[in-house]
Amino acid sequence: MVGVDAGGTASRAVVATVNGQVTGRGRAGPGNPFAAGPAAARAIADALRQALAGHDPAAVAGGVLGLAGTGACLDPAITAALGEAWAAAGLTCPYEIVGDAVTAFAAGTGEPSGAVLIAGTGAVAAEIKDHAIVRTADGLGWLLGDEGSGHWLGMRALRSAVHTWPSPFAARIATRTGAADRDRLISWAQGLPHARIAALAPVVCEAARAGDPHARTIVAEAVGHLTATLDAVAGSGPIVLAGSLLTAATPIRDGVRSALQERGITPLTSGDPSIAAAWLAVARLPAGDQAALHAAFFDAGALA
């Protein structure tokens, strides 16, 4: 089976046996068709070719592709490009496209239903039922939402820096951006270098860890936004935290986990979504202990 995680930062692919042994991996450029357009399909094809090296593509029985921006598949040109990417890797088997929230959830639990909160460059929460997205909250992009995300943290940091200049926090932000003074920082921000704005998130987290009051205020706001986003979709079932801000050791993760634990909820942490995609492909088969199979996939994947 083949599993693909096609995100806004990178495309990752794995080849795995039906028993959960990962036998091939690949990584290429961004696979989000909204952000990368037709180049996303080429990146997916590159990741697949790398993962399939040394394998016979004809032996692959099926696959699942977890895709950021699945609405792009309403575009016939993008749908055709994804099919061409599959074929370019030598694959002739059927495949299913699911939202990346589905693979992120499945990377944290073998249960079919629950909720997932993702916070990386963007932020979104989704209710999952039988490995399908039922409803979402936020995920609206940097202009309209993504509250508590890496990009949101960066924008909030810039606003704080220009309003508190020349505070120590403003100095941290200016140093990272290379701005020599407040006017240059304003000019830098107005250019909207989105990737570099999101890259300010670690600066905020580091400053919050060091006790900076401005950074701690921003982190507290982010935690509040993210828990509210999750509350909009969470029901019964496990809650999985995904995305770099919630899986790495950040004050955002600590704050969200603490807020949930105060309610008696112990969230799970998402693992590799490309492995989850491969597991989902196998889980579509009619037989087998899915919980045991999930454990096998992630135990094997961790060692591969």
Q: What are the residue ranges of the model-derived segments?
A:
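ATP-binding/phosphotransfer module of carbohydrate and carboxylate kinases, centering on a glycine-rich
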Residues: M1-A59, A107-G114, L158-A304
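Fold-independent oxyanion-binding glycine-rich loops
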Residues: A6-G7, L67-A68, G99-A101, A119-T121, ...
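Short beta-strand-loop/turn "lid" adjacent to the catalytic site in phosphate-handling enzymes
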Residues: R27-P33, R49-A89, E96-I97, A106-G110
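A short glycine/serine-rich beta->alpha loop
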Residues: N32-F34, G69-T70, G139-E147, G264-L268
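Glycine-rich beta-strand-to-loop/alpha-helix junction loops that act as flexible
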Residues: V64-G71, A119-T121, S236-A249
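Glycine/charged-rich beta-loop-alpha catalytic/anionic-binding loops adjacent to active sites
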Residues: G83-L91, A132-G141, R257-I265
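Active-site nucleophile and cofactor-binding loops and adjacent substrate-binding regions
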Residues: Y95-T103, I118-A119, T266-I275
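Glycine-rich phosphate-binding loop of actin/hexokinase-like ATP-binding domains
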Residues: P112-H163
